[in-house]
């Protein structure tokens, strides 16, 4: 961390640095730069190329040193387009790795990989910057306690709980509610934990990035009138950008999150959408640098690159970074090296189901496919574990019986199976929940449900306490008391209709 007096005026910085090189070769986004003997920059140092192209347009390209080639030459990868660059142009060694602005002033803003705001809201009101390349926290600094990160979302907290400072994989296709779930998590961490969030858009569509920004403004996650009240900082390196930018944008987002954890001592949520694109960009850069490809054409350093990012996402004694990473699985092949390497780092998986979304059950989290390493009696306690297992068993039995019901009907089932089906349908509906960020769509006020309330509700349903209540009473409510109140209202309405 350092206070950077030159962030507002890069020209001052360039005049101060006397370490000048010249472009010797350009191959797409890769530059070879020659420096005077004894003046070689370090690996990961930022290099800046300034000048004018043949049309007189100003050029300002930042690169990152990747290899020292010998003969006083380095090979660097550009973070933006290299059109207009020529051999012989001056290159300035900045003497440090890429540094990005950090702190409260980043909230409510959109940045690119270099930490430059791209939202037309003027410069960022901070002089504190931090380099994007750092070591992971030392083991002695880590908080090794296994504690649950309560989200206030029933289906997540009960069946696939998140670990504080853990990593969660989010699997889901288009239109099943991934964005709404992400926004609700951002909202809940701000309200319940006083925490903030950082969103890293890695190699995804520009349109999706813009849609997310607009939805965040609509739902109040970003407050345009008073940016200081915003709960999230956005960092985008979209799929039209060079591989260097897509490879480093995850580190830019992580660096901003680390400041909130280490200096502000907060709980932080870090979203990475999509972690596969980080690997894909690394693969492109590796090929451009001439490295021998590994399995399925991926970079030989795949595990190292993934590990250096994931090991920085952790809980320390000061605060925590809990990361939720969208995982694209190429051709649905879970053995592909990219997702397989990612799975090794995940503590929990949240799988969104199109079938549940089609039924109108939101959040459409699949209760049987979602998993968590935290769901063990010694971590969550016997009561939580037993309740979760009974819920899963009931839903699994219902799933097995669905074919029989479709062919023969409910009447052909045994008394015990009919009771199981009735309870499973209530559980399925009780796993739905009105979200704060979806109030404008549903017309229902959002609900945050504590873990103890969640467990109590499901225990009562499993015990048969509410067998007489209609299943509709359990749909889109918060805790179990709201379900009983809704049942009373439904009964009164039906009497009035008669």
UniProtKB/Swiss-Prot annotation:
Q: Which residues bind ATP?
A: 172-179
Q: What is its main location?
A: plastid
An example GO CC term for this entry is: mitochondrion
Q: Which residues carry this modification: Phosphothreonine?
A: 6
Q: Which CDD domains match?
A: ATP-synt_F1_beta_C (cd18110), ATP-synt_F1_beta_N (cd18115), F1-ATPase_beta_CD (cd01133)
Q: Which UniProt keywords apply?
A: ATP synthesis, ATP-binding, CF(1), Chloroplast, Hydrogen ion transport, Ion transport, Membrane, Nucleotide-binding, Phosphoprotein, Plastid, Thylakoid, Translocase, Transport
Q: Which reaction does it catalyse?
A: ATP + H2O + 4 H(+)(in) = ADP + phosphate + 5 H(+)(out)
Q: What is its EC number?
A: 7.1.2.2
Give residue numbers for the modification (Phosphoserine).
13
Q: Which GO terms describe its biological process?
A: proton motive force-driven mitochondrial ATP synthesis
What does the record give under GO molecular function? ATP binding; ATP hydrolysis activity; proton-transporting ATP synthase activity, rotational mechanism
**Gene3D superfamilies xrefs:** 2.40.10.170, Bovine Mitochondrial F1-atpase, Atp Synthase Beta Chain, Chain D, domain 3, P-loop containing nucleotide triphosphate hydrolases
- What HAMAP family does its record include? ATP_synth_beta_bact
Q: Please explain the role this protein plays, according to its UniProt record.
A: Produces ATP from ADP in the presence of a proton gradient across the membrane. The catalytic sites are hosted primarily by the beta subunits.
Family of the protein in this entry: Belongs to the ATPase alpha/beta chains family.
Q: What is this protein called?
A: ATP synthase subunit beta, chloroplastic
Q: Which organism is it from?
A: Arabis hirsuta (Hairy rock-cress)
Gene symbol here is atpB
